[in-house]
Swiss-Prot record:
Protein name: CRISPR system Cms protein Csm4
InterPro entries per record: Csm4, Csm4_C, RAMP_III_fam
Disordered: annotated span: 332-355
Name of the encoding gene: csm4
GO biological process: one example: defense response to virus
């Protein structure tokens, strides 16, 4: 397994859409990351080579695009009731818990080892170990965070840090098919797009398991990942969004390696947490414990067809909790009408001549749920 670190260009902006240009996701999901890597693979080696290696490519495992603050790596909060419900903790409100979105991997490891006492010391954690009310870090990382951002306050909850900022930009609408400006009352129709920008100390990363020993295939896959430097990620790249100064493939940092190593002491835990989007196969349904759902859709990104919508599909979000036997799946979401007789007889139907896949085999992180009786 490897980590890919993506350093944004200075003043880079990103649009990771969620069905609306005016709404921007903080996470670029693993299914979209898979699509970007596959499209880069085609640009480098052609569709014929892709088809030859399609099963190898479908079997890789990916996390979503996550954040790192220098050497502090953030992962999603587990979608377990323990991290949403309060039981007799004076001075803490339910919203204090619900606002938390991420753990550092070091804090998460301490959670696995029962060193982070979530049940009995939640007020201390919220006051001293939580950045911007949304990111829980280890006590061992507090001084580093204060040094990086010049924080003088004793309690982190009193510090205001702009890690990720949102920006709205106004654009003129263009007809996707005719490539002309859409007008209303003889004026160009305007719309808003939301972008995010990262603090200079914040970068992206994701994890990838090649799940294969074929050195030639791995070399091609890594070249496709490196091409993200030039091709970028996310929407609105035509107007300068989504680009990176550097993309590096590195070994796993120590905390990740200790948790994910094949000989890790955590491998005997019964549960796992998803670090990417999970699409259950028919045998996985019984292994789903706690989850949130995301609807995957949007338009197909292909040089042969730029205006066809994908079939929508529901998937488990990052942070969902499953049992050890969960595998995940890769689904064909090609438009349903591409094979019907009417389209076959229409020369101008803008028909795809290849399959469109969405990836749902995420990196899984061992998870140790509390033994209290939380309801589903």
């Amino acid at each position: 397994m490897k980590m890919v670190v993506l350093k944004p260009k200075i003043n880079s902006k990103f649009h990771f859409g969620e069905g609306s240009l005016e709404r921007n996701s903080k996470i670029f999901h693993s299914n979209s990351l898979f699509s970007a890597i596959v499209n880069n693979y085609i640009k480098l080696y052609g569709r014929e080579d892709l088809e030859k290696n399609i099963e190898k490519i479908k079997n890789i495992r990916l996390s979503s695009l996550l954040y790192k603050i220098k050497n502090i790596y953030l992962i999603p909060k587990p979608e377990h009731p323990e991290f949403y419900k309060l039981k007799g903790n004076p001075g803490i409100k339910p919203k204090d818990i619900k606002k938390i979105q991420f753990f550092s991997i070091k804090a998460y490891k301490e959670l696995l080892d029962n060193e982070l006492d979530w049940k009995n010391k939640i007020k201390h954690i919220v006051d001293y170990q939580t950045i911007n009310k949304s990111i829980v870090i280890s006590e061992k990382e507090i001084e580093e965070i204060k040094r990086i951002f010049g924080i003088k306050a004793e309690k982190l909850k009193h510090a205001k840090i702009s890690l990720i900022s949102k920006h709205l930009e106004q654009k003129v609408a263009i007809d996707r098919l005719k490539d002309i400006t859409l007008e209303k009352d003889d004026k160009g129709q305007l719309y808003n797009i939301e972008f995010i920008k990262l603090n200079e100390n914040v970068e992206f990363y994701f994890l990838i398991d090649y799940n294969n020993e074929d050195k030639e295939f791995i070399k091609k896959l890594e070249a496709s990942i490196k091409l993200i430097e030039d091709e970028g990620l996310g929407g609105k790249r035509s107007i300068g969004a989504g680009f990176f100064e550097k993309v590096e493939i590195v070994d796993l940092p120590e905390d990740f390696n200790e948790i994910l190593d094949e000989n890790s002491k955590y491998n005997n835990l019964e549960y796992k947490m998803l670090l990417g989007v999970g699409i259950p196969n028919k045998d996985d349904i019984k292994n789903i414990e706690y989850y949130k759902l995301i609807e995957i859709g949007g338009y197909i990104y292909s040089l042969e067809c730029l205006t066809k919508p994908k079939r929508n599909i529901l998937a488990l979000t990052e942070g969902s909790i499953v049992k050890n036997d969960f595998i995940g799946d890769v689904k064909d979401i090609s438009p349903q009408n591409d094979d019907d007789e009417q389209n076959k007889n229409n020369e101008n139907n803008n028909k795809l001549n290849h399959k469109v896949y969405t990836h749902g085999k995420p990196i899984l992180l061992p998870f140790n749920p509390k033994r209290d009786n939380y309801g589903s």
